[in-house]
Amino acid sequence: FCLPDGEQMLGYPVAGSGNDTRPGKRRYNFVWYRPASEDKELISLLTDDDGHYYPTGIPPLKVSWKHIAHMRQVAREILAPQYAEILEKTAAPFLQAIYDVRSEQIVFDRVALMGDAAFVGRPHVGMGVTKAGDEAMVIAKYIAQLGATPQALQAYSDERLKLGQQVVARAQYLGRYMQAQGSKGTRDTDNL
């Protein structure tokens, strides 16, 4: 971890090509959480050098060279030298906007929302894939018990709605805490 004021950087080894985990063959994944205003900074970050704006996410190789140069400059100024070096050596860094989605309802008639369609929390809790898999198992359980009925979908909602909301709240809390925002010694017992 590296925690510059109001930001967060983390990194960890992952398997390399062919799922290789031998020393020297692994890759290194890193994430730098940086706040950006939605009205100006984010729009600029999601606009390529040809002026094309990608509102839902810019393709990795389309990130403007100006933003990459600026990122590397800021990294040298505020990050630990090891992380600044990683950013210097990354040939094609990419960026992704992070949004929170907290649904108030996940069942609509004969439609049930699951996974990221129902809730999207900041990556700090690491629940995206796990939550989607759990939701698939829960809805399968209720369909097996009650058939493909509105009652099965309601049972699914009863079990998963509050949990999904709690996951998003916890991710928001951890994100604020890790970025040293809103964590001035207060204890948020609802989201611990």
Locate each region found by the language model:
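Conserved FAD-binding catalytic core of PHBH/FMO-like flavoproteins
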Residues: 1-68, 72-74
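Short, conserved, surface-exposed binding loops centered on an aromatic residue
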Residues: 19-23, 75-77, 83-88, 103-107
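Conserved mid-domain beta->alpha element of the FAD-binding
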Residues: 30, 68-70, 88-173
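Short acidic alpha-helical/loop segments enriched in Asp/Glu that coordinate divalent cations
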Residues: 42-47, 82-93
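Short, charge- and proline-biased low-complexity linear segments
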Residues: 46-49, 169-179
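Alpha-helix-centered segments that form part of catalytic cores
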Residues: 60-84, 92, 179
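Short secondary-structure junctions and interdomain/linker hinges
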Residues: 78-82, 105, 163, 174, ...
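C-terminal domain-closing interface element
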Residues: 177-192
